[in-house]
Amino acid sequence: MTTPHLDSAQDIDLSRVHLIGIGGAGMSGVARILLARGKTVTGSDAKDSRTLLPLRAVGATIAVGHAAENLELSGELPTVVVTSFAAIPQDNPELVRAREEGIPVIRRSDLLGELLEGSTQVLIAGTHGKTSTTSMSVVAMQAAGMDPSFAIGGQLNKAGTNAHHGTGEVFIAEADESDASLLRYKPNVAVVTNVEPDHLDFFKTPEAYFQVFDDFAGRITPNGKLVVCLNDPHAAELGERSVRKGIKTVGYGTADAVQAHPEVPAMATIVDSQVVAEGTRATINIDGQEVSVILQIPGDHMVLNGAAALLAGYLVGGDVDKLVEGLSDFSGVRRRFEFHGAIEGGKFNGAAIYDDYAHHPTEVTAVLSAARTRVKAAGKGRVIVAFQPHLYSRTIEFQKEFAEALSLADAAVVLEIYGAREQPVDGVSSEIITDAMTIPVVYEPNFSAVPERIAEIAGPNDIVLTMGAGSVTMLAPEILDQLQNN
């Protein structure tokens, strides 16, 4: 089925929207905004979850399980059906009925594009760091009194939500490239954190993946700006190409990266950063104004994300000092180096449990490097990781890189591959990663046995990370219990 791409709010009636998979991170966010705008929202999800409770509380009618009759509300059908074409099969009974009834079926990105209309659009794109950078931008702009609307792929720890319909002119959102959805938007400010081949099951070649970011840059409004990270080679090259095309482009990055790419005017330069007791202290020059910010979440990649967030806020009129105050107050996003607890007493005294969404070698490297920095600053402990590969295609494509990245830990437990939307591949297991690792590693295909395996490896003051985009997140509290009670 061909999915319509809509050009204006007049093309579709959003008065009564049905969302299939409403409990997902992206879908639940747009549902919140629709409800805040007074729309009637129904939806369905395969299983009940804590995500559905607040949506029901503000007026959504949600069914658990998929059935044709879920489309009806008091005998009336929706004006539009929204779905994720990657996650929802085409024989879903609600999709089938929508087609039979002639109801328009659109993607989440089409809906988000409609919701963005009329706002000053700040879109955060890139292979890695979208959710963190978007979240930092939100918190910074909120502190600057801008009350932006936002839709992000994770839940802000402090706000406890992934979306908000604000009173300000700015709307901040992630621009997902995985299926070229980012080409639905017309940003006023487009941030590209990095560009590295991914989602090759969709794009087929790295060249096609790179091209989608060039196309995205071409959709920026005439008076808008492209913002690129100069520390990332492909993002910097995108910036250089865009400058030559006449697209207004600025860069951010460390001083050496800024010097290496003089063709892209730098508007945010990281002058210095160092680990301190509170986190990471960074000195950043924003368009000639030098500011100091303390980031609670560790890692050089988070300093870069913070610089991007400050620059995005500055470009849409935010006061730099207030933006910095907000950024210093940023406590993270669910599943991004998320703290679950520490052990007090016993043989695991001082061990701390964290959970992270990292599922690409570059992300794994960044998170483990940040953990190592924290251990080094403390002068004690090790880094232990429980990693669950996500998708067979990604595991096969990056098996060598995963082995190298995971070897930054001191020891690891690697779970079986989480296939998600993919079917198992004969002869392929997580052992293609573990066989190439250079640290002590346990391949553990039994999900429920992982906490025990971690207890056999961990020690006092260790940082223990559960990592991956699948079900591994459920193990963080179980590992905490295992170590606390062992």
Curated annotation (Swiss-Prot):
Catalytic activity: UDP-N-acetyl-alpha-D-muramate + L-alanine + ATP = UDP-N-acetyl-alpha-D-muramoyl-L-alanine + ADP + phosphate + H(+)
Gene3D superfamilies from the UniProt entry: Mur ligase, C-terminal domain, Mur-like, catalytic domain, NAD(P)-binding Rossmann-like Domain
Pfam entry (one): Mur_ligase_M
EC number in record: 6.3.2.8
Location(s) in or outside the cell: Cytoplasm
Gene: murC
Species assigned in the record: Corynebacterium glutamicum (strain ATCC 13032 / DSM 20300 / JCM 1318 / BCRC 11384 / CCUG 27702 / LMG 3730 / NBRC 12168 / NCIMB 10025 / NRRL B-2784 / 534)
Binding site for ATP: G126, T127, H128, G129, K130, T131, S132
A GO MF label: ATP binding
Protein family membership: Belongs to the MurCDEF family.
Entry keyword set: ATP-binding, Cell cycle, Cell division, Cell shape, Cell wall biogenesis/degradation, Cytoplasm, Ligase, Nucleotide-binding, Peptidoglycan synthesis
A GO cellular component annotation in the UniProt record: cytoplasm
Pathway assigned to this chain's UniProt record: Cell wall biogenesis; peptidoglycan biosynthesis
Stated name of the protein: UDP-N-acetylmuramate--L-alanine ligase
UniProt record, GO biological process: cell division; cell wall organization; peptidoglycan biosynthetic process; regulation of cell shape
Disulfide bonds: none
